[in-house]
From Swiss-Prot:
Its EC number is 7.1.2.2. Gene3D superfamilies: 2.40.10.170, Bovine Mitochondrial F1-atpase, Atp Synthase Beta Chain, Chain D, domain 3, P-loop containing nucleotide triphosphate hydrolases. It is an enzyme of class 7 (translocase). It is a peripheral membrane protein. It comes from the Eukaryota. Keywords: ATP synthesis, ATP-binding, CF(1), Chloroplast, Hydrogen ion transport, Ion transport, Membrane, Nucleotide-binding, Plastid, Thylakoid, Translocase, Transport. GO terms for biological process: proton motive force-driven mitochondrial ATP synthesis. The keyword Thylakoid applies. The gene is atpB. InterPro entries: AAA+_ATPase (IPR003593), ATP-synt_VA_C (IPR055190), ATP_synth_F1_bsu (IPR005722), ATPase_a/bsu_AS (IPR020003), ATPase_alpha/beta_chains (IPR050053), ATPase_F1/V1/A1_a/bsu_N (IPR004100), ATPase_F1/V1/A1_a/bsu_N_sf (IPR036121), ATPase_F1/V1/A1_a/bsu_nucl-bd (IPR000194). It is found in: Plastid, Chloroplast thylakoid membrane. Belongs to the ATPase alpha/beta chains family. Transmembrane segments: none annotated. This is ATP synthase subunit beta, chloroplastic. The lineage of its organism: Eukaryota, Viridiplantae, Streptophyta, Embryophyta, Tracheophyta.
Amino acid sequence: MRINPTTSDSTVSTLEEKNLGRIAQIIGPVLDVVFPPGKMPNIYNALVVKGRDTVGQQINVTCEVQQLLGNNRVRAVAMSATDGLTRGMEVIDTGAALSVPVGGATLGRIFNVLGEPVDNLGPVDTRTTSPIHRSAPAFIQLDTKLSIFETGIKVVDLLAPYRRGGKIGLFGGAGVGKTVLIMELINNIAKAHGGVSVFGGVGERTREGNDLYMEMKESGVINEKNIAESKVALVYGQMNEPPGARMRVGLTALTMAEYFRDVNEQDVLLFIDNIFRFVQAGSEVSALLGRMPSAVGYQPTLSTEMGSLQERITSTKEGSITSIQAVYVPADDLTDPAPATTFAHLDATTVLSRGLAAKGIYPAVDPLDSTSTMLQPRIVGEEHYETAQRVKQTLQRYKELQDIIAILGLDELSEEDRLTVARARKIERFLSQPFFVAEVFTGSPGKYVGLAETIRGFQLILSGELDGLPEQAFYLVGNIDEATAKAMNLEGEKK
């Protein structure tokens, strides 16, 4: 469904038209509000409570209607803390769903779930807003052609390619390079696709959000001197926020991304960190609303809620939203309903390995664990598919031989296996790559490697043409020509 942004100045109607109710009950982040007969607000309408608490502090709490209880009562979930609210306080029905600012003015800024800037850089310079609740695009509007989304990152493009308008799960523990990979993708989509990115921080640590913002400023993804030239908008609803805010912040980020896709007709990257927290917040809200819990205590509406978010992330004939979602797996149990429901929507998985990070191979993407539904000959072509399969076979054989090497040493292997190991070690190093956003830390200039160059490089390694080059020459280079040039430099240094 195409976006219809509004350009009104205020979400609250004029005084004469105000629909006023009063708080009847407060249960933590849940409010029951009584309205006059015949003036009930609709489900998902935004309600605003304005007033002063007992010590005279100004209160401004926005809530969202979740249930109509009968007897002129509605139950609403607050988007911020309900401290200081009392029974009998006046509640204004805005007559519409929560609306957030959209468009180019959002780039380089940090927002909360309500679309209010929280970066102390003043108000957002836009009057265009859009409601966070919307149905998914109609099937007739979808672009059903399967096409690869080129990232310029060798290991991703070759072994687990992303689908344009697809959904990718990003799995990785702390300190293996998730943030740097996310920033590189934001940088590359801006350079190669002329696209923008939206980052939705859903229920994660405030410190991580702050670190990401600082690193983005340091690497130039957010341009401090000219905010308008930034490549990303940030939307945060962190761990300390009420469940209502954490449940809706993903929709706020998605709404901003939809505007870039539908109105600006751009390719958009939408990052959600972490999709599990979206489910977790929904579970809390479900319990607060008194719904009967389902399997493992999750909400009975788990699949519906996940589907309503994921179905809006897609390619239309105007543009695309490609989503990269960090997935936390509780207790490493992949059968838990939250990750299991998420997997049903994913087109590709990018798994980051601590073992590779420890070896200093960055990006630390595990070439054997990462998967993609796009890696089929009819989609990527025979040449790409064959090269990817041969790379995986070589790495798999190397993995099988590692125990023998550890116990007996390389000399005990057959000639063929020794050759396989040598090529696998070159491939492993050639899968590393210097990043643009890491230039400030490493001093090495970043490299964007096109898909054709990537395939050519790995074909040359597999064919044995480069067997004579030292494996160090393949470490942290862009295309294969840089590896051969580096090998010549290493030879020169030895002499």
